[in-house]
Amino acid sequence: MTESSLNVLPQSSGLLARPLLVRFGAMGDLVLIQPMIRLLAARYGAPVDLLAAGGWVRPLYQGQPDVGEIHLLAKRKLPLWLSAEKRQLLQWLQQTGPRPVWYCDFDEKLVPLLAQAGMDERWVVRAKAVGTRDGEHLVDFSQRLARTVPPALRHVTEQRMEVSGPHGGQPAEAAGAQTAHPAAPSRTQADLDDRDPNLGISATMQADVQDWLQAKRWLGKPLLLVQAGNRRTMRTGLRRRMSTNTKWWPEDNWAAIIRMLAERHPDAVILLVGAPPEADLNDELLQRAGVVQAFNVARELPIPRLLALQARAAGMVTVDTGPAHTAAAVGCPLVVLFGVADPVRIRPRGGNTPVEVLQAMHDGKPDMTAISVDAVVQAWQRLPLRQGANGEDTAASAAGHVSYP
């Protein structure tokens, strides 16, 4: 153990009990906690295990630096006696023994299960107890959460910091019985200074997307991405326009944006991305736009390929959804259309990635349909596009983002 690692974790059966991060949310929510994972791994000298939900979590995080085991729980509301997966989760938690837990959800449905596994309030840092601040972005909140030390580790943490020497620059945070401490020096100081999501692109991911682009004859051409759909757009026709779909923007508007991209960038390939259920919407947009250089690839994009594609794209226009956050995290410049969600708290962030955020009001309330086509065009004109990212020898590291074997 070196002075640069704050390794204060207990031992269980001779194995290191790694930090556990609990976060149940949409893809964007999970991307926004990536800096928290990085910070916890640096502070505690071990990969961070992740408890979440959704089939996309493993493709998003499996193999990413600083991530340990990934466990999924699809149905949190089921009682223990009815849920085999919850009983399996309890068994795994009991086998690993007491460990520090960062519980990032405010509903706290699984706090009793953690206590049953031996991780009571002494071991758990609860987001609800720490509390958010007005105007605080979720990335910054998660950083404060990561710097909060569970009471069970407070004494040994203070001893470790006394041995390592004083650390300045980070005020302590109080959260009931929990106390935050300044971060210990990381593997490199830049790791802790980088507060924004930064997803790695593996060599396997790079090779896959390059082969795919080569087969499509798109390798070497500027790539422009359009994400019009979200999880609600699997509905068709008038149901897309339901009041519950706060991320709907008129199809004719999207068609106008696709035509604008084609006119301004005649050498580019325009790719309509998304999940397979959003492919029908993309087909409709292509029909309305009538652009020969635009293609629907929503049926061909597993998450690792999407990330690698975004790492090569010159720019993207998107609604506020998960792929907007992954784009920012791999350095893809983007224009993001927001509905009712607060961009102050959840706008995509990615270090130096250029992000143009648009939001408009209708009858005094945020409404995505109030965003004009002209506003999107002007935002695109302001956006500094990435040049030369889709070459035959392009690597994600060339764009300033992590690449790993």
What label would you give each PLM region?
Residues 1-405:
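Catalytic machinery of carbohydrate-active enzymes
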